[in-house]
C-alpha cells in the first residue's frame, strides 16, 4: 500500500491506522523510492534538467516544478541508469521570512510521519544546527529524522532559517521533506563529497 505524502498538508485526511513498514511505501506527487522518474517526466526532460550536484558523480538529480503541493521536488537517481529509478525524493516549501510558520508546519508533518512510520524507525528529534553553506554562521536549520531500523533509509524533515545576508540574495526560509533510500543515505554519508 502506498501512502501519499503529497497530501501531508491536509493533515486530518490521514487515518491513524495507516502504517508504512518500508521507505518505498511513502509517495510524493505519485512517485516513490524505487519508481522510475519516467512515470512523470519524459526522458528528454530528464536529460535536459539532469545535474550532478555532488563531488562524486554517482547520483544525478532533477528538480521538478510541476507539483500541486510543493514549490519544487528534487529526485535523485544513479547517473548511468537509463530507467531513472528514484533513490531520493526531496520536497520543498518556501516560507518567505517566516521561520515560525515553517517550524509549525514541520511539527505537523513530523507528527503525521511519526504516526505512519514511528513503529518501524528510530526518531532523532529537532536540534538547532548551523547551516554549513552560510560562512557567516548566521543561518540555522532544525532537522529531525526517522531512520528505519532494518537499514539506513530515512525520512528527514527540516526548516532552514536563512540569515539576512542570504535573504537579500533572494534565498528564503524553507521546509524540506527528504525521503532517502538506504543506498542514497549511505552515498551521502560515505561517498558524496569524496
Describe each region flagged by the PLM.
Residues 21-59, 90-194:
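Non-cytosolic coordination micro-motifs
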Residues 62-108:
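Mid-chain, structured segments of secreted extracytoplasmic proteins
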Residues 3-17:
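Sec-dependent N-terminal signal peptides
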Residues 1, 10, 55, 64-65:
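Short intrinsically disordered, low-complexity segments
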